[in-house]
């Protein structure tokens, strides 16, 4: 029988029981909605909703548009209760459920991020902080993720105030992802989350206007997987020692394996949760089967192996 211990993976100094996490923004504020389906402790981790220093109401509705067969556009606008309310009302729930907790932090200016992180900097319940530098559906939401100097400055300031590991979540809407990655890592980021949603647009042919009130939104789902894989591939090839958290279009065990092979140390499941709330557990079980068939002593043996043409593996 395959041991769960062999599914352990390291993201820098962070050890996760398995490489499957719930992605921010796809599991409510603190994943309470998943309680009927599985125990949060079974996952590698839970990434919270993006949290800001003050509560946010989000964008006008409609906020979500389904793109049939391809995915969805969202323009939520980072609606959230604020970091103080989260710590008071939601963090105890995640602790009670023995979840591995990754707090996603967002802001519009540097002080927003600094103040939010300052509020949680000493919380030993938190495994890592994911800095959302790349939300495409709020004003200024891409600035930090598209400018290496701004990214460096922000991550540097955050590293000054907390010893909690920092993951920088980056945008695919850039010319060269490795420039932004280098800036974040040079500033002290302990890992990079690749990728956030792709900027997209949907048109209502009846109103002859964009479907979303803000016109554009963040595109997610199966269609963005090749973009995510390419950026993870480029990052791992140039910086093989930088821990990567893979995100983007993962809906199956095969998808997760491809991300690991490209260089990700773990992956986050996002849009697939809306289709099948049990998908994360199904992928974890699929990874066990894959490791058994390939006689792997550790899931970490897969990480980056697509860059080594001498190795082949058995299909699940």
Language model feature labels by segment:
Residues 22, 46, 86, 103, ...:
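Conserved, mostly hydrophobic/aromatic
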Residues 1-101, 107-108:
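N-terminal capping/small domains of soluble enzymes
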Residues 133-149, 180-242:
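Glycine/Thr-rich beta-alpha phosphate-binding loop at enzyme active sites
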Residues 73, 81-98, 146-168, 212-244, ...:
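Alpha-helix-loop-beta-strand connector modules within alpha/beta enzyme cores
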Residues 48-53, 133-135, 191-201, 249-250, ...:
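Glycine-rich phosphate-binding active-site loops on the catalytic face of alpha/beta enzymes
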Residues 31-36, 113-123, 174-187, 237-239, ...:
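Catalytic cores of alpha/beta
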Residues 59-69, 203-217, 260, 272-297:
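C-terminal helical cap(s) of enzyme catalytic domains, especially alpha/beta-barrels
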Residues 27, 104-107, 170-176, 242-254:
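Glycine-rich beta-to-alpha transition loops that act as phosphate-gripper elements at the mouths
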């Amino acid at each position: 029988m395959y041991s769960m211990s062999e599914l352990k993976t390291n993201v820098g100094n962070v050890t996760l029981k398995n490489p499957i996490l719930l992605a921010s923004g796809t599991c409510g504020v603190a994943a309470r909605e998943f309680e009927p389906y599985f125990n949060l402790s079974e996952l590698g981790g839970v990434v919270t909703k993006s949290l800001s220093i003050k509560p946010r109401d989000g964008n006008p509705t409609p906020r979500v548009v389904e793109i049939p067969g391809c995915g969805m556009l969202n323009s939520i606008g980072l609606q959230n209760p604020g970091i103080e309310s989260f710590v008071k009302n939601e963090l105890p729930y995640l602790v009670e459920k023995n979840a591995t907790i990754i707090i996603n932090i967002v802001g519009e200016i540097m002080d927003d991020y600094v103040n939010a992180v300052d509020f949680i900097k000493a919380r030993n319940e938190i495994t890592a902080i994911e800095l959302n530098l790349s939300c495409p559906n709020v004003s200024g939401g891409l600035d930090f993720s598209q400018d290496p100097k701004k990214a460096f400055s922000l991550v540097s300031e955050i590293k000054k105030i907390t010893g909690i590991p920092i993951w920088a979540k980056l945008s695919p809407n850039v010319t060269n992802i490795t420039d932004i990655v280098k800036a974040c890592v040079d500033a002290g980021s302990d890992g990079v989350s690749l990728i956030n949603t792709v900027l997209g647009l949907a048109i209502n042919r009846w109103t002859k206007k964009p479907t979303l009130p803000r016109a554009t939104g963040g595109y997610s789902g199966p269609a963005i997987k090749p973009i995510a894989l390419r950026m993870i591939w480029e990052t791992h090839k140039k910086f093989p020692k930088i821990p990567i958290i893979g995100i983007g279009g993962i809906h199956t065990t095969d998808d997760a394996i491809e991300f690991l092979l490209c260089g990700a140390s773990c992956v986050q499941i996002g849009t697939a949760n809306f289709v099948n709330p049990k998908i994360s557990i199904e992928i974890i079980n699929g990874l066990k089967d894959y490791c058994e068939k390939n006689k792997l002593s550790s899931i970490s043996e897969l990480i980056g192996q697509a860059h080594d043409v001498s190795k082949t593996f058995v299909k699940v």
